[in-house]
């Protein structure tokens, strides 16, 4: 058992949202301590040129990034690169601040190495996030995940407002229409609803725009979103968000039922997230950048996503269960596979179908 595993057992004695607050507070302190940041970055981050790539015009030093949902307000923005991530996605950010859903709204499923959440886009609003983005000192790659306010009746206007304000301050934007925790949001994944949103975001910014989809979409709907993304010349697709499915869980059904509604993230998404990635890659090839997220717990799983067509990876729940060692392990594992296959860079591995080599 590692030191982090021991710490995790102690942390799990506290409510999940309390732990999130403690970790966020520590990272915000690191964010403010520039000298410590630099020492951490040198000691923890995997600096290997084979991991570097240029994706939609942005230079990524490494492929694994923090998924949206952890740093909703970009309050620890300068700390994510220091602890090893190649980039970080802030948000989800809405035009106006909102409290999200009532607590408790965050639950652990340790038997599944998963989390169930129904946070509901709790955030301080686009203006606060814009100020935090302007104040950042690092030049690490930062994406912004944007959504609509819960009470808004004009989704297009919400996405326009946030993309106009934040687009110029980010390296890329992600249109989130796939969270299960805002009533009616997932309905916006239907092409007739999604088209005007993506069109207005594209017109509002010159920053690369991606769309994030749910794992629960039918294959036909996945194809339709992919085709629309190609037609509108989006930069890419992030696949996938949390799932509303409860199948295949090790946690007793009665316990999960008591937790209530919400999306599940972590290990249970592994198979479906990979299926969606493969379908997208078959559909769009290299016309779009694919960002894979959901159930990437090991270096071997990360390599499988890269060779199945993902240029970039993301994680949130595995970071909670694995800590800094998870980030470092993923990057070291990918770098070792690139070299073992005689490749010069990660770009040559993307979509290659190369299998994992035991080293």
Curated annotation (Swiss-Prot):
UniProt cofactor(s): FMN
Cofactor: how and how many bound: Binds 1 FMN per subunit.
Membrane topology (UniProt): Peripheral membrane protein
Entry binding sites for FMN: 68-72, 92, 145, 176, 212, 240, 266, 295, 316-317
Binding, substrate: 72, 117-121, 176, 181, 241-242
Active site (record annotation): 179
Catalytic activity, EC: 1.3.5.2
Quaternary assembly: Monomer.
Name under which the protein is recorded: Dihydroorotate dehydrogenase (quinone)
Lineage: Bacteria, Bacillati, Actinomycetota, Actinomycetes, Mycobacteriales
């Amino acid at each position: 058992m590692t030191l982090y595993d021991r710490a995790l057992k102690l942390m799990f004695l506290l409510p999940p949202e309390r732990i999130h607050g403690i970790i966020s507070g520590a990272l915000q302190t690191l964010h403010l301590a520039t000298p410590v940041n630099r020492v951490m970055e040198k000691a923890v981050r995997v600096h290997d040129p084979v991991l570097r790539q240029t994706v939609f015009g942005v230079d990524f030093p490494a492929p694994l990034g923090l998924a949206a949902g952890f740093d909703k307000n970009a309050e620890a923005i300068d700390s994510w690169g220091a602890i090893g991530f190649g980039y970080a996605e802030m948000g989800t950010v809405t035009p106006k601040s909102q409290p999200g859903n009532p607590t408790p709204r965050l639950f652990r499923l340790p038997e599944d190495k998963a989390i169930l959440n129904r946070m509901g886009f709790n955030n301080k609003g686009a203006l606060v996030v814009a100020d935090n983005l302007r104040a950042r000192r690092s030049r690490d790659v930062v994406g912004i995940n944007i959504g609509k306010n819960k009470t808004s009746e004009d989704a297009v206007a919400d996405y326009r407002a946030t993309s106009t304000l934040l687009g110029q301050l980010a390296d890329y934007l992600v249109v989130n229409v796939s969270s299960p925790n805002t009533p009616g949001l997932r309905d916006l994944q239907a092409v007739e609803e999604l088209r005007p949103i993506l069109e207005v975001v594209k017109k509002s910014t010159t920053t690369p725009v991606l769309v994030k989809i749910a794992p629960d979409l039918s294959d036909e709907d996945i194809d339709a979103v992919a085709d629309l993304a190609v037609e509108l010349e989006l930069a890419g697709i992030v696949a996938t968000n949390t799932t509303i499915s409860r199948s295949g869980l090790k946690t007793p059904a009665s316990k999960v039922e008591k937790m209530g509604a919400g999306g599940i993230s972590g290990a249970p998404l592994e198979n479906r997230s990979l299926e969606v990635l493969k379908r997208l890659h078959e559909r769009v090839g290299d016309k779009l950048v694919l960002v894979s997220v959901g159930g990437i717990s090991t270096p071997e799983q990360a390599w499988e996503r890269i060779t199945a067509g993902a240029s970039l990876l993301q994680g949130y729940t595995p970071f909670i269960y694995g800590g800094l060692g998870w980030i470092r392990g993923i990057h070291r594992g990918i770098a070792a596979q690139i070299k073992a296959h005689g490749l010069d860079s990660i770009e040559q591995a993307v979509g290659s179908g190369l299998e994992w080599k035991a080293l």
